[in-house]
Amino acid sequence: VAGNVTKEVSYKAEIDLCDEGKIKMLDAYTRIKPWKTLQLTIGQERVPFTIDAHRSPHQQYFANRSFIAKQVGNVRDVGAEIGYTWNVGFPIVVNAGIFNGSGLTNQKDYWTKGVNYSAKAQFLFPNVNLVLSTQKIKPSDITVTMYDGGITFHKGGFIAEAEYLYKHYSKDAFHDVHAFDGFVCYDIPVANPKSLVRKVSPLARYDFMSDHSDGTRYGGSDTELGALKINDYKRHRVTGGVTLSLAKPFISDIRINY
C-alpha cells in the first residue's frame, strides 16, 4: 500500500504474506519531498544498497531471488535516509542513511555502539545504469562492511545486468565473501490486444556465492566467544525460464523458472 498524504509527503507499507511460511512486515516508512531533487525517508525500509536486493518482490525478474538479493545483501532496517538528484547531462542519484544495524529480526539500540550506514550512487546514462554502493552493519561484536557494484543495459525490450558484491568481516572473524549475479531478459509483446497475456519474456541467469555468514556467532553470543556460523554454503546456480505478463488493470506476472 502506497500513497500521498500531501504533494510533499508520501507513505508505503508492504507485507510479504509468505516468506518461507512466515508473514513479514517489509516496508513501513514516511517520505518527505520538499522539492523535486531532495527526499527524506524515515522508518523501516530496504536500505540503499545493491541493485537486485533493493527490488521489492513484485519487481523481481525471477521466481526465486538471486543470492545477492536473498542471502548476502538482503538488508531491511529501521533508520533515516536522505536522497538527492543532480543532472549533469544525465541524472546522478545519491542516497545515504544511518540505520539500526541489526536488521529486522533483532531490533536493539545500536546507536551507542557506532554509526551503521548505507550509501548508494546511481549514474543513469542513456540505456546504461551504473550503480555503486557500500554498507556497514554490526549484528554482533563483529563489524561487517560490504561493497557492491553493478551495471544494467536496457534498450527496447532487452535488458542485461551484472552485479558483484564483496563482504568483509572485522577481526578476521570470517573469510571475505564474494557474490555475483548476471542475467538477460527480452520482452516480446503479444500483438493481439484482446489476449490475456500482454507480453512474453524469456530470461536466463547465472549467480554465485562463496560461504557466507550473517555476522552472528553460534549460540547467538554478542561476545567474541564462539565462531561465526556459516548461514549459507558456497554455491553456483543457472536459472532459465519465461515470464508471462497478464493484462491490466492489475500488473500480474506468471514466472516459470527452472
Label each residue range with its predicted role.
Residues Q39-R46, V75-A80, Y110-V115, D141-G149, ...:
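Phosphate-binding glycine-rich loops and adjacent basic patches that engage nucleotide phosphates
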Residues I15-M25, V72-V75, L104-K113, I137-V144, ...:
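Solvent-exposed loop/turn segments connecting transmembrane beta-strands
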Residues Y29-K33, R55, N129-Y258:
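Outer-membrane beta-barrel pore domains
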Residues V1-G101, K113-V115, A121-N129, F183-D187, ...:
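Outer membrane beta-barrel
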